Amino acid sequence: IFILFILWEVLVRALNVEEWFLPPPSLIFNELFSSYKIIFDHFLTTFTEVVVGLILSAVIAINIAIVIFFFKNLEKSIYPLLIASQTIPVITLSPLLLVWFGPNILSKIIIVIIISFFPIIVNFLDGLKSVDAEMIKMSEQFGASKLQIFYKIQVPYSFPYFISGMKIASVSSVIGAVVGEWVGASSGL
């Protein structure tokens, strides 16, 4: 990578490429260091949108997944809506959310929630359903209630699935925050 930066610097200077078109790495790093306060302030805004949106998305997704898991009839009506919600590009919803909620942090957090909600709920619900049936039968034979089975077997078993959904959602939440800021924001990356 260091060699690429040196090559880039030499070629830009040797070919007299305009700085506005392709600035040399030395100029980029110089600007980064001289503007670190501004960049850090904007980073904090984006970071706040991502973290708050991701936490709210996880809380909402876990609660809806639990409701769907316990009420099987709801799965037939809610799950298709969840899948259909993923067909709408978030970038088309961004201007609407901006108009409805204003150009503040709330509209960006809602975009993050929308974009990161689906992988969390799908993975957590899959984890709840994937518990070995033999383990559940054995727990019932030992006298465990449905609530005990849920909290002591199914939730811990679904934790790796939840973490997998959070990994996917954490990447997409950054994309959601940046898209929201791109459509309309006064601060953020």
Region spans (language model):
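Glycine-rich helix-loop "coupling/hinge" segments at transmembrane-helix boundaries
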Residues: 99-100, 128, 175-189
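Transmembrane alpha-helices
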Residues: 110, 114, 147-180
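Generic hydrophobic transmembrane alpha-helix motif, especially the helices
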Residues: 83-119, 126-127
